[in-house]
Amino acid sequence: MTTPKVINRSRREEILELAVELFAARGYHGVSMDDIGARAHITGPALYHHFKGGKEEMLAEALIPVSARLLAGGREHTAAHADDPRAALRALVTFHVDFALTSPAVIAVQLHELDRLPSEPRHRIRKLQRSYVEEWVGVLRRLRPELGDTDARVLAHAAFGLMNSTPFLGRDSLAERPRIAELLTEAALSALDPEHRSTP
């Protein structure tokens, strides 16, 4: 009895992934339900069976779970290294770099299309994002007590700017993913921790 639900959920996730790729490539307003349907090999009207709220529902469902997973992952890593802020910072950076390299389309949509959402889901996403940033701020302040909240927040956002550059690297960069991960990790850690030493 549960098999149809699993199939439906998988199909829904597949459609969401395709929609995000289209939103990232063409912009939210440059993509129609028919465009998404064509990419997913389903008629545009039939998409409303999966997403009754249309594109808005797709956009919200693509971004809210991602923001929630980032926050949950951030909390998990900071808790795992509660007694070692430098290890916590490395864990956070490694975690976010992995996300950035595996989800560049999601990042592009977050950066450029979030304001297309109605206020309720938009505010929910913003709240999750702010909480995620505060995980980084807490780690930075434990590592560098001389920093105030504002300074730590500025540094965290600067590091996000580095790590979230993956949408601009192009598809050819996928073959160089290990090297790009290393470069982004070292750049972020160097920006955040003056005492960071590159690993050999």
Please provide the spans of the model-predicted regions:
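Helix-turn-helix
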Residues: 2-3, 11-14, 18, 22-57
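Hydrophobic/aromatic-rich alpha-helical bundle segments in the mid-to-C-terminal region
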Residues: 107-111, 121-130, 141-188, 195-200
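Hydrophobic alpha-helical connector segments
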Residues: 76-102, 155
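Alpha-helical DNA-contacting segments of helix-turn-helix folds
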Residues: 51, 58-66, 110
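N-terminal intrinsically disordered/low-complexity leader segments
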Residues: 1-10, 196-200
